[in-house]
Amino acid sequence: MTEYVLILISAVLVNNFVLVQFLGLCPFMGVSNKVETAMGMSLATTFVLTLSSVLAYLTWAYILVPFELEYLRTISFILVIAVAVQFTEMFVKKASPLLYRVLGVFLPLITSNCAVLGVALLNVRQEDATFMSSLTYGFGAAIGFSLVLILFAAMRERIAVADVPEAFRGPSIGLITAGLMSLAFMGFSGLIKL
């Protein structure tokens, strides 16, 4: 049980995929103008990232490794992610049309989110990966992505009404803010050693 808590804390804070490993920067910068859109994107990404992490592990452990097809890892994980996104889109459309309209634009964007593929690839590189560790790692990465995305969106909303010098307006102040957030998350770097 302690191992899973450590994996979760490590994925959320210590090795955050956006601020430490620089994965998922496109949605991080592109969808973080408003907190509402950031929450929608983070909700959809949390579900897809967790699901695709587990499916990628199962594909790796029960198809690719037994049949010695490890070289097909990347292409098979891209296929798994696309299937997970399509499944999620169909399920949400059927279960909650209102939620589908809210998340509709974000679901196709998740397919091209490099953080989802990065989590799947890094997940199977662990020597002692199990089903539960893959689930925990994927969920922790998703929570870390969501946390950073929502915090960054809240800061960008505050910056939008602040008196920022002309040269720093727009993406410039966004990148400076992201850098400062990354420095803040570096404070967690000695917290856990796995």
UniProtKB/Swiss-Prot annotation:
Calcium is among the record's keywords: no
Domain of life: Bacteria
GO cellular component: plasma membrane
Membrane topology, as annotated: Multi-pass membrane protein
Localization (cell): Cell inner membrane
Pfam families: Rnf-Nqr
Enzyme Commission number(s): 7.-.-.-
Main subcellular localisation: membrane
Keywords, sorted A to Z: Cell inner membrane, Cell membrane, Electron transport, Membrane, Translocase, Transmembrane, Transmembrane helix, Transport
Any one Gene Ontology BP term: electron transport chain
Segments passing through the bilayer: 5-25, 47-67, 72-92, 102-122, 135-155, 172-192
Stored InterPro entries: Ion_transpt_RnfA/RsxA, NqrDE/RnfAE, NqrDE/RnfAE_oxidrdctase
Family: Belongs to the NqrDE/RnfAE family.
Assembly behavior: The complex is composed of six subunits: RnfA, RnfB, RnfC, RnfD, RnfE and RnfG.
Role this protein plays: Part of a membrane-bound complex that couples electron transfer with translocation of ions across the membrane.
Identification of the protein by name: Ion-translocating oxidoreductase complex subunit A
Species this protein is from: Alcanivorax borkumensis (strain ATCC 700651 / DSM 11573 / NCIMB 13689 / SK2)
